A protein has these predicted regions:
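Structural preference for solvent-exposed beta-strand-turn elements
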Residues: 2-198
């Protein structure tokens, strides 16, 4: 029986364009920064994940009650965003989301002057938020808080009259844990012509 032989010769040069999926974390940060900038820095190539779609709807539909479902990033970022934008809104989510604590972020925003009330249980969503210009410009947090709390606060810094200085302190503070997220925030701010120093 005759055997067929095939010889495959690779090309000397391979040229291709690859579209990588965008991080939902970066997409959600970019959406908040764009919203604070009144749409002058529109993000491109956004993630198509559920969290990002929830964020887009929340920022564009203008509803008084915002349901972020199970999107934890959206809950934290929007809580800070709604605190500095005019209007009274309620932000809620799934039953599981309403069991996830958010008191550290709410306390920090209140310290800056935000008007936030718990709808049902102290320390947990849903939240009723009256957005306004915040007068505070400096805050200290323990070093073991969620990096998303840090990002949520830093992202609204440019919306504060005198900017924001955020101190992270305590024996539980490990800069290496937060540096990648802060670097991501700083990169997005730089693209949006916002000043950041560390």
């Amino acid at each position: 029986q005759e055997m067929m032989l095939y010889k495959l010769i690779p090309p000397s040069v391979v040229t291709a364009t690859i579209q990588l999926p965008t991080s939902k974390s970066i997409s959600n940060r970019a959406l908040i920064i764009n919203a604070l900038g009144k749409g002058i820095y529109p993000p491109e190539n956004l993630s198509d994940c559920d969290d990002t779609q929830v964020m887009i709807k929340a920022l564009t539909e203008g509803k008084e009650t915002i349901d972020i479902m199970a999107a934890g990033t959206a809950m934290r970022f929007l809580t800070a965003y709604l605190s500095v934008t005019p209007g009274e809104r309620t932000i809620t989510g799934t039953a599981r989301m309403q069991q996830r604590p958010i008191q550290i972020l709410v306390n920090a925003l209140r310290e800056l002057g935000a008007e936030i009330e718990y709808v049902h249980n102290e320390g947990y969503p849903p939240l009723c938020i009256k957005g306004a210009e915040l007068k505070g410009n400096e805050i200290t947090l323990k070093g073991n808080v969620s990096s998303q709390y840090i990002s949520a606060l830093l992202m609204i810094g440019p919306a504060l009259k005198d900017g924001l200085t955020l101190h992270l302190s305590g024996r539980d503070y490990f800069p290496s844990l937060y540096q990648p997220y802060i670097a991501t925030d700083a990169g997005l701010w730089s693209q949006s012509r916002m000043d950041f120093s560390q």
